[in-house]
Amino acid sequence: MATIHVDVVSAEQEIFSGDAKFVALPGEAGELGILPGHTPLITRIKPGAVRIETEAGEEFVFVAGGILEVQPKHVTVLADTAIRGHDLDEAKANEAKRAAEEALQNQSSDLDLARAQGELAVATAQLAAIARLRRKR
């Protein structure tokens, strides 16, 4: 079966590098599915789970936003923050969500509001990714 090379990197480290049969991730306009030979594309990524189907099975990576570049034989995910699926911490995500909701209640400027909304979106997406991983196991 045809494959496409996938690199998922954050500012801190390379999270995944290898060949895949299929990649699914949350694009700015909705869920994207990438197969080998896909038309070139550059778009922003929303917080959520990147699902990478390899010959050996599925890999999950949580991204907190970033940029996606697709070429016919190569996919690059430049993530603001990326965490391997098995490294996600539900307690930390719940605490981050609670803190963001509290910040929304106590915001004093438009900047505080925007920051709190962004943090809430990331925490909520992280919890959804954790729930999705649990269903797969």
Swiss-Prot record:
Belongs to the ATPase epsilon chain family. F-type ATPases have 2 components, CF(1) - the catalytic core - and CF(0) - the membrane proton channel. CF(1) has five subunits: alpha(3), beta(3), gamma(1), delta(1), epsilon(1). CF(0) has three main subunits: a, b and c. This is ATP synthase epsilon chain 1. GO terms for molecular function: ATP binding; proton-transporting ATP synthase activity, rotational mechanism. It is found in: Cell inner membrane. It is a peripheral membrane protein. It comes from Ralstonia nicotianae (strain ATCC BAA-1114 / GMI1000). Keywords: ATP synthesis, Cell inner membrane, Cell membrane, CF(1), Hydrogen ion transport, Ion transport, Membrane, Transport. It comes from the Bacteria. Its main location: membrane. The gene is atpC1. Produces ATP from ADP in the presence of a proton gradient across the membrane. InterPro entries: ATP_F1_dsu/esu_C_sf, ATP_synth_F1_dsu/esu, ATP_synth_F1_dsu/esu_N, ATP_synth_F1_esu_C, ATPsynth_dsu/esu_N.
